[in-house]
Amino acid sequence: MSGEELSGSETEGDAAVRFVLVAAVADNRVIGRDGTMPWHLPEDLKQFKRTTTGHPVVMGRKTYESIARQLGGPLPERHSVLLTTRDLDLPEGAEAVESVESAVAAAEDAADEMGVETVYVVGGATVYEQFLGRAAGLVLTELDAAHEGDTRFPEWDRGKWVETDRDDRDGFSFVTYERKQPAAADRGAEESDE
């Protein structure tokens, strides 16, 4: 992906907010080990920053805490929506919600305030699973090797997605997928991607 925002779809003249999952995924679907990424790819971190800056991001508490430990707070130049049942004291630029529906509403409000049409879902595994059925796109860093880990990206039916961009690198690829049909939540159906 060239760092450009994925295109949004229009309905009745209003831009619809799109949810796009962003993840670095090993060949065996591993995305984490002991609360951290089991690899260090500076190019992936730069790609993540280029992709998500200026947009709302949805994540779980553990993902937020991992980011906050490294950065000293929420991701800069993004509005973080944390999906958690815990009562957290969060700095400006981050808010906690207790349900997927509340996360969707908060992210849509933030996208409207920021003037963007795309919300990025950035982990962890449970949050990816909760949003996969409503995702319009996937922005993945696909590692060419398997890694040991305790956290995996959810299984997804590649037949429901079309690869729209690929940038092969040494040992990994940046790959963008678009859903072939509207996401289940957009159709009003309760279908999943399994």
Swiss-Prot record:
InterPro entries attached to this UniProt entry: DHFR, DHFR-like_dom_sf, DHFR_CS, DHFR_dom
Regulation: Maximum activity at KCl concentration of 0.5 M and activity decreases with increasing concentration of KCl.
Pfam families named among the record's database cross-references: DHFR_1 (PF00186)
Annotated residues for binding of NADP(+): 24, 30-36, 62-63, 84-85, 123-130
Residues bound to substrate: D44, R69, R78, T141
EC id: 1.5.1.3
Name the record gives this protein: Dihydrofolate reductase HdrB
Source species of the chain: Haloferax volcanii
Gene responsible for this protein: hdrB
